[in-house]
Swiss-Prot record:
Induction: Induced by OBP3, auxin and salicylic acid (SA). Repressed by jasmonic acid (JA). Up regulated by iron deficiency in roots and leaves, as well as by nickel, high zinc or high copper treatments. Repressed by high iron, low copper and low zinc treatments. Keywords: DNA-binding, Nucleus, Transcription, Transcription regulation. This is Transcription factor ORG3. The keyword Membrane does not apply. SMART domains: HLH. One of its GO terms (molecular function) is DNA binding. It comes from Arabidopsis thaliana. It comes from the Eukaryota. It is found in: Nucleus. Expressed in vascular tissues. Detected in roots. GO terms for cellular component: nucleus.
Length: 258
């Protein structure tokens, strides 16, 4: 019954030479140094030798060329020029970067090119000049205010010495924060000048709004002055000090009668 089963690998009628002979044959061929050992033509060896010699000669020529560059003054001068040019451009870029940082914040939002930086700077210079003019004007106004305040403090801190010797009388009444009504009474036999009072008040930054004068039967003169003073920070109008100041201007500084 088993004889009827065909063999797994039929030999097709060829005689068997052994179970593993073919494998040994293949191993011997692979281990043999002559496997794929085809003869190489002599022209191939010559070409390889020529390429090797050419590479060696090329390396020598490159090295010699480098030495020639180092010893060539024209090449050295050109290299130095290129280095100087790079340094010059680096400095210029640094200067334009500094100029760009001086522009307003709107001009620093993005990196401007060199022409754009120059154009924006030329437009910004007149703006700065206008701001400088405004600041100078504001400074002058502040100096005028400070000077007026000092003048006011001067006569407030230096009242007349001989108040009791004055012949005339002065009374001041406040009408508002910067308004006052002043009445002067004096004898007409004394040659006092009201113009000196007005000049002194003008120096003290008082403005004369209205003025009137009258004469009584008792040979006395009366002057009524309505004054305004410019508003100065931290300055409070003192009627008593103003009265003393006007007495000083009216009697001690008077030269003629008007």
């Amino acid at each position: 019954m088993c004889a009827l089963v065909p063999p797994l690998f039929p030999n097709f009628g060829w005689p068997s030479t052994g179970e593993y002979d073919s494998y040994y044959l293949a191993g011997d061929i692979l281990n043999n140094g002559g496997f794929l050992d085809f003869p190489v033509p002599e022209e191939t060896y010559g070409a390889v030798t020529a390429v090797t010699q050419h590479q060696n000669s090329f390396g020598v020529s490159v090295s010699s060329e480098g030495n020639e560059i180092d010893n060539n003054p024209v090449v050295v001068k050109k290299l130095n020029h290129n280095a100087s040019e790079r340094d010059r451009r680096r400095k210029i870029n640094s200067l334009f970067s500094s100029l760009r940082s001086c522009l307003p914040a709107s001009g620093q939002s993005k990196k401007l090119s060199i022409p754009a930086t120059v154009s924006r700077s030329l437009k910004y210079i007149p703006e700065l000049q206008e701001q400088v003019k405004k600041l100078i004007k504001k400074k002058e106004e502040l100096l005028v205010q400070i000077s007026g305040q000092r003048n006011t403090e001067c006569y407030v801190k230096q009242p007349p010495k001989a108040v009791a010797n004055y012949i005339s009388t002065v009374s001041a009444t406040r009408l508002g924060d910067n308004e006052v009504m002043v009445q002067i009474s004096s004898s007409k036999i004394h040659n006092f000048s009201i113009s000196n009072v007005l000049s002194g008040l003008e120096e003290d930054r008082f403005v004369l709004v209205d003025m009137s004068s009258s004469r009584s039967q008792g040979e006395r003169l009366f002057y009524t002055l309505h004054l305004q003073v410019e508003k100065i920070e931290n300055y409070k109008l003192n009627c008593e000090e103003l009265s003393q100041r006007m007495l000083y201007l009216y009697e001690e500084c008077g030269n003629s009668y008007i």
